[in-house]
Amino acid sequence: MVENLEKPIGVSYKNSPSMSKRTAIRMKKSSRFSILLYSVLSTLLAIANPLLTYFANGLQTQNLYTGLMMTKGQIPYSDVFATGGFLYYVTIALSYLLGSSIWLLIVQFIAYYVSGIYFYKLVYYVAQSEIVSIGMTLIFYIMNIVLGFGGMYPIQWALPFMLISLWFLIKFCVDNIVDEAFIFYGILAAFSLFIDPQTLIFWLCSFVLLTATNIKQKQSLRGFYQFLCVVFGMILIAYTVGYFMFNLQIISSYIDKAIFYPFTYFARTNHSFLLSLAIQIVVLLGSGCLFGLWDFIQNRKKASYQIGLNFIACIFIIYAIMAIFSRDFNLYHFLPALPFGLLLTSNKITILYQKVIDRRSHRRQYFSGKSLIVDLFVKKTYYLPLLLVSLSIGLLVYNTYQNVTLSKERRDISHYLTTKIDRDGKIYVWDKVASIYSQTRLKSA
């Protein structure tokens, strides 16, 4: 039987279901199992897995080393340069206190699974289709591996809080939930900001959306009360975390390096600007997100929920611009923009899927279900995702080859340093990765 699809929110329609019904989503057990399976497979590819250590890039090794040094009394931001959130490094440090970084696989799995569940819900709200939702969720996981192979990036741990909050905003606009629930919203905001300060863009755009919604509905006082609830929720977390940061005397360093630095210095390396720009544009095109953004721009005036779609598009554009001008060859810079771009793309994929079903429902199809969604996604984006996959594999092979080639030298240097320097000594190493630091477990000078 052909799945009965309703038209997506990006296109105006009269006989729409009640919005409260659109948010009353009951996931099938098969969909939950699929997301669980995707999360497990993605987690097994994390660099916290000892078998994949050689695949770690400079940022991943630096993050693990920063967490390790917290167990040695060396504090991020003041003693070690760091741009991730305080709770992010604390979590890594706790894993080392428990004996191994392998404990981080549990954190990575939870992040993947919760992100997958709420990404599915968001797509289902747009598509009102089980097949489109699970198909786009599969693409979401594939792109997470392609762009952020090895995981362990702060944005991947903060993403569950962002997607839960986005779902919260949708339910607020649709179901008119109680204002006190914004305390929970504030808690989510605080956790995400202390894991990855880059999420500040999402929260600022959310504030604009809520303000615009309340002004449009002439509920300014109610909006102010909601704001107070958000602040109260944030204080519950910020006060606790801030207490430890204050005792460590790193609040000013944290604001400077974790908050101001990422938004004032887009260039992360001194690589060729034109070459890095070309690579990041390939990422933008290959992710399929530009396909969704272009469709949104073309049908913007027809959109049923312009404010909500504008909100998602705005966040995507800001994060995409930051990635394009990162002046770096690594692909992980596009991770913050990925879910928002795919949400825009899912709108167009839903329409194309409905056309295919309507045209071919009387014939037996070679593709069905998730494979049909992936097939539509790849073909309608002119096979550019395959180019992105090839680029990702090529960069991974190149970086791994370099790491393996230099691994013996790094091990020899690490062995020499551990025999010549006491445990409290400090070293300075000029290298692209922090492997020597991690292997010696010595503090950085």
Model regions and ranges:
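Extracytoplasmic catalytic/substrate-binding loops of multi-pass membrane glycan-assembly enzymes
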Residues: 51-66, 77-94, 98-102, 405-410
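Transmembrane-helix motifs of polytopic, lipid-linked glycan transferases
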Residues: 106-127, 164
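Transmembrane-helix signature of polytopic, membrane-embedded enzymes
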Residues: 119-142
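Membrane-interface transmembrane helices that cradle and orient dolichyl/undecaprenyl
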Residues: 127, 165-182, 300-302, 349
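Short acidic/glycine- and proline-prone juxtamembrane loop motifs at membrane-interface regions
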Residues: 148-158
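Membrane-interface alpha helices of multi-pass inner-membrane proteins
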Residues: 180-199, 203-208, 318-323
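Hydrophobic/aromatic-rich transmembrane helices and adjacent perimembrane loops
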Residues: 326-373
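Short periplasmic/luminal acceptor-recognition loop of GT-C membrane glycosyltransferases, typified by
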Residues: 402-445
